[in-house]
């Protein structure tokens, strides 16, 4: 069994990465034989979907697979064989990071079929989870409708893989030394 965690944060050792590493430790505790890997998206040079539609061309060599070749190609290939994926992103302006958004465009769109059933070509269904880290108190997150803005991407993940379990990590630290910044918190 192989499980991946996808870090959509530019930071490799801060809030999101820390939570994802702990989640992978939990996977290993539940199944010591499991293979796990944390992938840092900001370590890879790639674009979002370029709208070439090669993944939609019936009978084409890339049907159901992203045809773009760049730093995301090998990651998409590995994820096709995964047994579970944990996504993680800090929240910037009520949303996931831009790099995470580009990743989802490529990961999810390749599997979408334009049919009345909203079917998907994903190689298999698998458990998924999404970790959102943010420097926002829980109550403010709810009152400001953050969760509603997250539901759109979660619905696309559900269409392709499964309904993701979610974890909201609130009131996170942004700096290790707040005395160096103007921040009232």
Residue ranges with predicted function:
Residues 101-107, 143-153, 183:
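Short, surface-exposed, charged loop/turn segments at secondary-structure junctions
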Residues 39-42, 71-77, 119-128, 163-170:
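Low-complexity, flexible helical/coil segments
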Residues 12, 45, 137, 173-175:
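Flexible, glycine-rich phosphate/dinucleotide-binding loops
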Residues 1-89, 94-112, 185:
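N-terminal beta1-alpha1-beta2 submodule of the flavodoxin-like/Rossmannoid cofactor-binding fold
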Residues 112-165:
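Short, glycine-/small-residue-rich phosphate/pyrophosphate-handling segment
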Residues 8, 41, 133-135, 169:
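Cofactor-binding loop segments of dinucleotide-utilizing enzymes, especially the Rossmann-like FAD-
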Residues 30, 148-185:
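Glycine-rich phosphate/pyrophosphate-binding loop and the adjoining helix
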Residues 98-99, 139-144, 177-179:
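A short secondary-structure junction signal
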């Amino acid at each position: 069994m192989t499980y991946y965690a996808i870090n959509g944060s530019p930071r490799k050792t801060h809030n999101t990465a820390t939570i994802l590493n702990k989640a992978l430790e939990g996977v290993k505790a539940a199944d010591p034989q499991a293979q796990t890997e944390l992938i840092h998206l900001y370590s890879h040079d790639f674009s979002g979907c370029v709208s070439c539609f090669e993944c939609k061309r019936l009978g084409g060599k890339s049907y159901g697979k992203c045809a773009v070749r760049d730093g995301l190609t090998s990651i998409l290939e590995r994820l096709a064989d995964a047994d579970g994926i944990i996504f993680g992103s800090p929240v910037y302006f009520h949303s996931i990071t831009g790099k995470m958004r580009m990743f989802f465009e490529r990961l999810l769109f390749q599997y979408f079929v334009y049919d009345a059933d909203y079917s998907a070509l994903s190689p298999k269904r698998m458990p998924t989870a999404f970790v959102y880290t943010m420097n926002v108190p829980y109550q403010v997150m709810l009152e400001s409708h953050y969760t509603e803005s997250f539901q759109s991407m979660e619905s696309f993940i559900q269409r392709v893989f499964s309904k993701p379990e979610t974890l909201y990590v609130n009131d996170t630290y942004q700096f290790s030394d707040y005395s160096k910044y103007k921040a009232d918190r």
